[in-house]
Amino acid sequence: GIAESTKDQSSIGRFGIGFKSVYTFTDRPEIHSGEEDFTVENYVQPKRVIRTERADDETQIVLPLKPEDATAQDEITAGFKRLGPGALLFLRHIDEINWAVQGGGSGTYLRSSPVALGANVQRITVIGQESGQSEVDQNWLVFHRNVFTPGREQVGRVEVAFSLHPVKDRPGRWMVVPVAASPLVVFFPTAVETNLGFLVQGPYKTTPSRDNIPRHEPWNKHLVGQTAELLVEAMRWLRDNEMLDVSALRCLPLDREKFPEGSMFEPLFAASRRALLDEPLLPRFDGGYVAASRSKLARTQEL
């Protein structure tokens, strides 16, 4: 039935992502896929409908808008425009999104095949083009770590993604730069701001609306801990590849005021601070790296 899920633990649809939200705009969604053609009445009751013309591997979802909702089309169009190419960054089975509104705007978003740079690090490019707008081109450095239940069942991965900009006059070289905003991502952005200079993604348990997460849920705490360990691995990789510079350091959770004791992402602050103190991760003036506990900061005049 509609209420029964056969998806595995790591599936993006396990918690019904997106489906319940369609009832904001429709009372009778239709699904046409494979040999199935049905509508859903009263939220849970499937009813067979006439088969549509479509390719064998094509799925169609039809959402007849509520006739009394005069603002639905404008709201949906605004939602499409907010989507942006970044929506594809953490989706491993979707690499293209196209949308169009009759008599209105349109957009196309594409994700490149990831370029492997190490065992758990990739460079990913996403691009987007919307009607009347300049093309958007984003490059990301994405690190991942598989996560498991206490029974050792893999349930996806935690990821951290750093925004990349090309280094001027150095073809093929990239630098890490802080992002303007960093909402926690559970496949798609939530309303939870991380205060980080990079993006964090993982299979967090969310509220039914999927825009928030229970901060004291043990599973969510576990994922934050795994992300903290992954962040230190990323710092080491950036150092070894001569990318851990001042710009990259500005991405890290180093401001105690933003990560007070007991706050959700405080473990990332603690892990990065400990790593900087104990390991050679701080750039030296004369090249190379040194542990913060063994370094001195010169006055700005000398710098």
What spans do the regions from the language model cover?
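Flexible ATP-lid and adjacent glycine-rich G1/G2 motifs of the Bergerat
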Residues: 1-42
